[in-house]
């Protein structure tokens, strides 16, 4: 039995290493092939042809048929008398001003304590006090005694402060039936061996687009803003595959 325990441990470790190797095998091969080279920028592609792209579907009002009046320059349903150069059609470009500042402080403290004690016994059962036989030995005055104490003390706090200020150009990928625009923009900046990526997507109203063809990120509905990177610095900040596998499998 003493020899089988180390063998079981070896098998378990080997299985974990194999799992981690399979999980990151393809990624590791690509990283080995790119040693000493700068991370490559992704090619410019049509966002609607990317894997996983899904058109946005939102509740829409009933369509209204535009009518024209004789000798009138105004069309019913028009939102402006003169045409401007702001983004309005699929393929048009507008600038998104990302101005994000978030700060949160949360503190929780919980204390709980409980003490319970119970005694149970038989002092007299069918004249057991008058009977002097060995049977009286099984009828003690105290049969069961329980005593329990439990306590819980928990503290938690969250302190978070984030800020992001930048501009990114976005492309109109879809025009909804009510006139709202679905936009998506991606920006990549490479500095030495690190690439910083900024992705902005969401739904905007044409009325919220300013005269200089810009819009603030706070006016984007269903906004999806992602800011991250990839490269040598990001690799150092990420835990190794083996550690990630152990964190998932180990229950303690």
From Swiss-Prot:
Keyword Magnesium applies: no
UniProt feature coiled coil, ranges: none
A Gene Ontology BP annotation from the UniProt entry: bacterial-type flagellum-dependent cell motility
GO molecular function: cytoskeletal motor activity
Lipidation positions, renumbered (N-palmitoyl cysteine): 26
Lipid linkage positions (S-diacylglycerol cysteine): 26
UniProt main location, coarse: membrane
Membrane topology, from the record: Lipid-anchor
Source species, domain of life: Bacteria
InterPro entries per record: Flag_Lring
Family statement drawn from the similarity comment of this UniProt entry: Belongs to the FlgH family.
UniProt-listed PANTHER family: FLAGELLAR L-RING PROTEIN
Function: Assembles around the rod to form the L-ring and probably protects the motor/basal body from shearing forces during rotation.
Subunit structure: The basal body constitutes a major portion of the flagellar organelle and consists of four rings (L,P,S, and M) mounted on a central rod.
Protein name: Flagellar L-ring protein
Organism lineage string: Bacteria, Pseudomonadati, Pseudomonadota, Alphaproteobacteria, Hyphomicrobiales
Gene transcribed to yield this protein: flgH
